[in-house]
Design a protein with these regions (language model features):
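Mixed-charge, polar/low-complexity N-terminal
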Residues: 1-3, 8-9, 57-58, 63-64
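Amphipathic, well-ordered alpha-helical segments in soluble domains
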Residues: 7, 11, 34-41, 76-79, ...
Length: 91
């Protein structure tokens, strides 16, 4: 199961279900991606305003760090579910 192609509603429904996955680790991965997306948004807003030029340097760095976390968060969410599914199957 990969969570990257699911809608928010599908992920939330799966999280609320009685299945063992997704669980907290997968939710944390998705939250990481969402936090990174917000960091990119604020960086882009800052970079688009001449009046905030003094913050451009740090905004560029924040965006550089946050962009890879968009995909990493989803990858970690999927890895967590797959790992725990393997544990459940072993019992």
């Amino acid at each position: 199961m990969t969570w990257a192609g699911k809608t928010l509603q599908e992920f939330q429904a799966a999280l609320a279900s009685d299945d063992p996955t997704p669980g907290g680790g997968s939710a944390a991965g998705v939250a990481l991606g969402q936090a990174a997306a917000l960091a990119v948004m604020v960086s882009d807003l800052t970079l688009s305003k001449e009046s905030l030029k003094e913050g451009w340097s740090i905004s560029e760095r924040v965006k550089e760090v946050a962009l890879p976390l968009l995909d990493l968060g989803l990858e970690l969410a999927t890895q967590d579910s797959q790992s725990f599914d393997a544990v459940v199957e072993s019992f």
